A protein has these predicted regions:
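Conserved beta-strand/loop element in small beta-rich adapter and peptidoglycan-binding domains
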Residues: 186-211, 264-282
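Bacterial signal peptide processing site
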Residues: 19-21
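...with weaker cross-activation on analogous glycine-rich loops/strands in unrelated enzymes
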Residues: 198, 358-426
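Boundary regions of SH3-family modules and the immediately adjacent low-complexity/disordered segments
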Residues: 25-170, 174-176, 180-181, 187-190, ...
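C-terminal motif of bacterial Sec signal peptides marking the signal peptidase cleavage site
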Residues: 15-17
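Low-complexity, Gly/Ser/Thr/Pro-rich intrinsically disordered linker/tail segments
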Residues: 38-73, 77, 413, 418, ...
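Active-site nucleophilic cysteine motif
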Residues: 323, 333-364
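Second-shell loop/turn segments in exported
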Residues: 192, 262-263, 305-310, 328-337, ...
Length: 488
């Protein structure tokens, strides 16, 4: 009997457990299996009557994309122009030796590089306009924007930072738009007056101060200043900055390639013109550095075919590749929707060659050797462009718009530019646009065949100058003009 009691006790101990290291038994529930409803092949919708399907919405789509013979006749591809007109660069240009000092300039600031009045120019400039509902904005809205701009705190933070995502740079600390007049061509969508520029992922910046509510910060990049969302930037210390600057630079040559970390998690999309610090070269990828939202320096991977180490000399292969990508772009006023306008297209095009250009059109037109078109007629302008212009190294400038000279084709001067539309004017004087809305290669007579073409605004007739940005500047008398983004 004693033996059986001992055995029973032993079994109880074994089954129930008595040691301190044993864990309680956990019974795992079998997860429920959820499946979506089955689709039924039928012409009868199962949606309730109060839901309007997209195809049932009755709207009249404006027919503004008229036929433009330039874009049909001339190749909308880089190969013909590169093969005919481009040369492989033999020696480094002086401008290419100064890329680093321009690119990293924001990290050298100890305080804001301009005064508060200059930074806050927009407060007095914008006191009326239309909002997202196309209704006039009340004066109280502008007063609130002035209050939120908090320029009493200008240059109070004085911190070096970096962009952790692609950002829209705004004139006011708000994502809401401001239109001059939605009823007039060129004064409504997409020309949001508050879209100042954009900031690339991992781009160096300097933080001046925060908005009154703290949701926005006023920053300086190497090419612009304005408001960005505070949660899109992080502050860096001196050790981090020096660590990033010491690395070789990786120049991105592809758009919209997913960049992932070592765990294959998405970090950002690639963008032509983006620069990343290089860590290592692997079999298929470049390993580069980025800063995450906690301010920690981490690694991501870039496919080898989407970047190159250091800036390259201007060459036909690279021109072909970059230009082909950029010709796919739709028009993006001030970088809206992560697209490009005229000046950002040219700026990004030349960045992989280690050439730094300013952001706005008027400033770009002052880089390098400037040749004025004052007192020249159209025939003389064409002759001068053919004589002096260097394909892919020359900018043609009219007020508010820049075009990259890509040489001649069938004896015509050809330009690559990202353009919103062709100006029109009917017999009653009503102005309009034939929407192009993308990057194109055209002559300087683009749109001359369009109905009601406004000949007074033809590209060739309105050209003011040309500048070879790879050549050293020469002193000339030039009228100062405040730069504006293009809305051609």
């Amino acid at each position: 009997m004693i033996f059986f009691r001992y055995v029973a006790f032993t079994l109880i101990v074994i089954l129930s457990g008595c040691g301190t290291k044993n864990s309680p038994v956990v019974i795992k529930a079998v997860p429920a299996v959820h499946v979506p409803p089955m689709c039924i092949e039928s012409n009868v919708t199962t949606f309730s009557d109060d839901i309007t399907l997209a195809q049932e919405i009755e709207i009249e789509i404006p027919q503004k994309a008229a036929k433009v013979s330039d874009l049909d006749h001339y190749p909308q591809a880089m190969a013909p122009y590169v093969n005919l007109n481009a040369n492989n660069q033999a020696n480094l240009y002086e401008i290419q030796k100064h890329f680093d000092e321009n690119y990293y300039r924001p990290w050298t600031y100890q305080a804001a590089p301009i005064c508060a009045k200059e930074a806050g120019w927009y407060i007095s400039a914008f006191r009326a306009g239309f909002g997202s509902n196309l209704r006039p904005l009340p004066l109280s809205w502008f007063s609130e924007m002035e209050k939120q701009s908090n320029f009493q705190a200008f240059s109070s933070l004085n911190q070096s930072g970096i962009a952790i995502k692609y950002m829209n740079m705004r004139v006011f600390p708000t994502a809401n738009p401001l239109y001059k007049n939605p009823q007039k061509a060129g004064d409504g969508y997409p020309f949001d007056l508050l879209q100042n520029s954009s900031v690339a992922f991992n781009e160096p910046l300097f933080i001046s101060h925060a908005s009154l509510d703290g949701a926005w910060v006023y920053i300086f990049t190497n090419s612009a200043s304005g408001w960005v969302e505070a949660n899109s930037v992080v502050v860096l210390n001196n050790e981090q900055i020096e660590s990033l600057k010491r690395k070789e630079k990786l120049f991105i040559t592809d758009d919209k390639i997913p960049l992932r970390d070592r765990d294959k998690r998405f970090v950002a999309y690639s963008r032509i013109g983006m620069v990343l610090p290089l860590v290592e070269v692997t079999n298929d990828n470049y390993k580069a550095l980025y800063v995450d939202n906690s301010g920690t320096i981490k690694e991501l991977f870039v496919p080898k075919e989407s970047a190159h180490i250091g800036s390259s000399l201007i060459n036909k292969d690279e021109l072909m590749k970059l230009g082909s990508h950029l010709l796919r772009n739709t028009y993006g006023w001030g970088g809206m929707f992560e697209e490009r306008d005229c000046s950002s297209m040219i700026r990004d095009f030349v960045t992989p060659f280690g050439i730094w250009l300013p952001r706005n059109s008027a400033q770009q037109a002052k880089k390098g050797e400037v040749i004025s078109f004052n007192d020249l007629n159209n025939t003389q302008k064409i002759a001068l462009i053919k004589e002096k212009g260097i394909p892919f190294e020359t900018i043609l400038y009219k007020k508010g718009h820049v075009l990259l000279y890509v040489g001649t084709y069938e004896n015509s001067v050809m330009v690559m530019h990202n353009i919103w539309g062709i100006r029109t004017k009917d017999k009653e004087g009503l102005k309009g646009r034939v929407i192009v809305g993308r990057a194109v290669i055209s002559t300087l007579e683009l749109g001359a065949d369009v109905e009601n073409f406004d000949a007074s605004n033809m590209l060739l007739s309105t050209l003011l100058s040309m500048n070879i940005f790879t050549k050293a500047p020469i002193p000339i008398a030039q009228k100062k003009e405040k730069g504006k983004l293009s809305k051609i």
